[in-house]
């Protein structure tokens, strides 16, 4: 859900996804990422909703991590961005690293950043807003948010990378971004699984309002 941090960190010691998973699973979680991030193979940002994979065993963790590394794990997101994206399809490839002016943020950093690739498809256009789908080849911190802001289309509500004006009349707390789809091979059975997470209510309401215009 929105506003839930994946694992404990400074300022977020409780109420995280890891706290909830540990309560549910106890010690039956992968230990590869240590006691702070048991079972966590990949993350989504605090204000990003949707699905992610949690592994109970080290073997499963290694298997899923390898799929993410070799791009066989399909990760698709839905988001609303500010502005009219004119190209129906596109790819953003700027390397991402820490923002030298603000260490809490990420930025396009071709010199010291890591390669990052985001593919996008326009789903609907609403004048000054565009509803989009994103497919990740890499999984850098804040990747979609940084890439879209870098081409002049920050995510609706993402004041960190788009400034205060990007929340519009909705006064949102954080980016309008949803981890919609996961496709991966089950580590034990070899079956290809597809997980789809429905859009959250707030997201659906914004889309409905934009469609009425």
What are the language-model segments listed below?
Residues 21, 53, 79, 120, ...:
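Residue-level signal for inorganic ion chemistry
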Residues 43-44, 84, 123-125, 158:
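Residue-level recognition of beta-strand microenvironments
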Residues 1-91, 95-97, 202-211:
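RNA pseudouridine synthases
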């Amino acid at each position: 859900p929105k506003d839930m941090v994946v694992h404990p960190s400074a300022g977020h010691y409780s109420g995280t996804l890891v706290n909830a998973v540990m309560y549910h699973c106890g010690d039956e979680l992968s230990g590869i990422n240590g006691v702070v991030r048991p079972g966590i193979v990949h993350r989504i940002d605090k204000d990003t909703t949707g699905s992610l994979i949690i592994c109970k065993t080290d073997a499963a963790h290694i298997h899923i991590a390898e799929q993410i590394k070799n791009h066989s794990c399909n990760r698709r997101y839905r988001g609303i961005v500010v502005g009219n994206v004119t190209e129906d399809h596109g790819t953003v490839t700027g390397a991402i690293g820490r923002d030298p002016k603000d260490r809490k943020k990420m930025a396009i950093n071709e010199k010291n950043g890591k390669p990052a690739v985001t593919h996008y498809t326009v789903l609907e256009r609403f004048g000054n807003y565009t509803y989009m789908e994103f497919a990740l080849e890499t999984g850098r911190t804040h990747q979609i948010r940084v890439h879209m802001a870098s081409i002049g289309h920050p995510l609706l509500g993402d004041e960190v990378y788009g400034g205060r004006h990007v929340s519009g009349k909705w006064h949102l707390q954080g980016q309008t971004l949803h981890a919609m789809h996961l496709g991966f091979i089950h580590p034990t059975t070899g079956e290809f699984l597809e997980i789809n997470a429905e859009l959250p209510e707030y997201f659906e309401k914004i889309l409905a309002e934009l469609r009425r215009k």
